[in-house]
């Protein structure tokens, strides 16, 4: 399939290390994928679901001890420990290679080695990057064939180039004591052993698209970010694009596939999804920032996905999808999860494969982190620009978190540098729903805390450098918080489709169509500039209350930020210290 010397030399090395019984190249053809699906069903690795109701859909169960990403077992193996930074785990690269190769040695005996050439981003796009993953798991092959562009076309584009990322995955014995996910940024190398779970083994996803790519982006002058990309089309047919970063459990996928309120739809407003998780962004020839989604599918959390919360995501899963660790309805050979509907199956198997009655059981049928892997093309609102190699121009970057008080519904940063500060202080708090008591504030700068492949202080500096490069063309930066609570612990803002009203204000600010009120933290909307027409059980007085900026609360917030910044030591850019001082000063006035 290729004569690329660097690829063939590495594969010889891998064959010698893991000693497979046979080697299969993944060419991307439907015939080959179909024969692999058949094989996976014969061995029990996958279960073929009801082909009338769920055509091309399959169910897979992971080992019970292998159900999520493992941050404690995830390492950045940079040559110098200080390049890894305080937010990552470090391992010395030579020691790591030795340990990993010892674990991997001979582990494919009796197994097949699958070689997956894949492109992150549209094949041949100037923003795309190529990887090769070697795996002993058909489940990984079939997921990668949904999540990335795979096959011969990728090798054709690669040609003789040595610019590609190596990925070795070995299931081994799924021994959690010997489970490691290691990244070697200087070597473009990822090694994952003793896991079969999505985020640990689909090496194109967080491992390559964020951890390795963030390092490449810093060195090559572009950005790899944990952000959705969506397009907003107005009644005149013009589309403007925004990217948005949220920590987990803040509704990123829901926002990416938002359906505008009925009043807006009737006027002709539409939302188009470009991506729900990762954005690669670089400056275009016209000086603006352009974004692509490096992925080709959605790896979404199943529980809570339903026709009300996110119809577009649910519709995306109705064909050609792999479900992982959800409940199996034996009556009609379909799947079920908590929050899908109010009618759990009685004759079912839970995510561990044990008999389960959803009406009487105390246990959950689906694992809380159970997943669907669905082709992006299935999404009813997928953007026409999805495969566009040069990407889409970004008008605004939105940061967000889950805060009960303090942070207003939306505010705009004063400028790019202040926007970097806003992203660096992003936080969510765990709310104990029953008591309405506010939990612990967990800061997750730009939602990249678990995914930045190098020192976060250098990462902040890279943001400042990108701002300098973009100059006048830099997108405007905003922060949103859909999660303000009243004193009884109820959400004040209706959220979901109504979030479109805030997006509309954001775009008006980008176009200079509305004024805003300057506050201690940035620009906040005048309440009358957010359209409340057709909104249920909500009034302008409540809106005013969630747009308030409480200086005393922000002064306290500044203390928390100062504490958080300490860990970055002298790698923290001086500009962030200056921004913090400005915030303190503004709150004291």
Region spans (language model):
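Conserved internal helical-beta-strand scaffold that buttresses enzyme catalytic cores
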Residues: 2-250, 260-589
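Hydrophobic positions on the alpha1 helix immediately C-terminal to the Walker A/P-loop
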Residues: 255
């Amino acid at each position: 399939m290729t004569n690329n010397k660097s690829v063939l030399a590495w594969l010889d090395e891998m064959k010698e290390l893991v000693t497979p019984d046979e080697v299969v190249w993944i060419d991307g053809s439907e015939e080959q994928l179909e024969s692999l699906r058949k094989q996976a069903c014969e061995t029990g690795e996958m279960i073929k679901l009801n082909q009338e109701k769920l055509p091309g859909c399959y169910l897979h169960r992971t080992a019970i001890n292998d159900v999520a990403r493992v941050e404690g077992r995830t390492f950045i193996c940079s040559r110098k420990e200080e390049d890894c930074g305080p937010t990552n785990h470090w391992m010395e690269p030579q020691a790591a290679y030795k340990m990993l190769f010892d674990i991997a040695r001979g582990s494919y005996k009796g197994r097949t080695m699958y070689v997956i050439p894949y492109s992150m981003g549209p094949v041949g796009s100037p923003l795309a990057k190529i990887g090769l993953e070697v795996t002993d798991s058909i489940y990984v092959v079939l997921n990668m064939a949904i999540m990335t562009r795979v096959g011969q076309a990728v090798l054709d584009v690669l040609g003789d180039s040595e610019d590609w990322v190596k990925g070795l995955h070995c299931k081994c014995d799924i021994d959690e004591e010997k489970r490691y996910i290691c990244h070697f940024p200087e070597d473009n190398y990822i090694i994952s052993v003793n896991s079969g779970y999505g985020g640990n083994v689909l090496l194109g996803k967080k491992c390559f698209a964020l951890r390795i790519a963030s390092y490449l982006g810093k060195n090559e002058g572009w950005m790899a970010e944990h952000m959705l990309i969506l397009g907003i089309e107005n009644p005149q047919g013009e589309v403007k694009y925004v990217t948005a970063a949220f920590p987990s459990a803040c509704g990123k996928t829901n926002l990416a596939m938002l359906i505008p309120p009925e009043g807006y739809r009737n006027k002709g407003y539409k939302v188009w999804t470009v991506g729900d998780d990762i954005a690669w962004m670089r400056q275009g020839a016209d000086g603006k920032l352009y974004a692509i989604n490096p992925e080709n599918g959605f790896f979404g959390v199943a529980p809570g996905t339903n026709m009300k919360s996110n119809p577009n995501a649910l519709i995306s899963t109705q064909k050609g999808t792999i479900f992982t660790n959800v409940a199996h309805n034996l009556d009609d050979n379909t799947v079920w999860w908590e929050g899908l509907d109010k009618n759990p199956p009685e004759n079912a198997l839970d995510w561990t494969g044990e008999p389960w009655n959803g009406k009487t059981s105390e246990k959950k049928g689906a694992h809380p982190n159970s997943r669907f892997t669905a082709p992006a093309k299935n999404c009813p609102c997928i953007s026409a620009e999805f495969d566009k190699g040069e990407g889409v121009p970004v008008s605004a970057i939105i940061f967000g978190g889950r805060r009960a008080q303090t942070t207003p519904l939306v505010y705009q940063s004063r400028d790019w540098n202040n926007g970097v500060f806003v992203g660096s202080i992003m936080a969510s708090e765990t709310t104990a729903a029953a008591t309405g008591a506010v939990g612990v504030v967990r800061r997750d700068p730009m939602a990249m805390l678990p995914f930045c492949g190098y020192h976060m202080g250098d990462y902040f500096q890279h943001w400042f450098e990108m701002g300098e490069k973009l100059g006048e063309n830099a997108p405007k930066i905003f922060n949103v918080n859909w999660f303000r609570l009243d004193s009884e612990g109820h959400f004040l803002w209706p959220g979901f489709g109504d979030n479109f009203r805030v997006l509309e204000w954001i775009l008006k600010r980008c176009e200079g169509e509305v004024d805003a009120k300057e506050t201690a933290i940035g620009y906040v909307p005048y309440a009358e500039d957010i359209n409340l027409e057709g909104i249920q059980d909500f009034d302008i007085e409540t809106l005013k209350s969630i747009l308030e900026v409480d200086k005393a609360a922000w002064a306290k917030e500044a203390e928390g930020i100062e504490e958080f910044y300490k860990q970055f030591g002298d790698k923290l850019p001086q500009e962030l210290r200056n921004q913090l001082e400005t915030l303190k000063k503004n709150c004291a006035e």
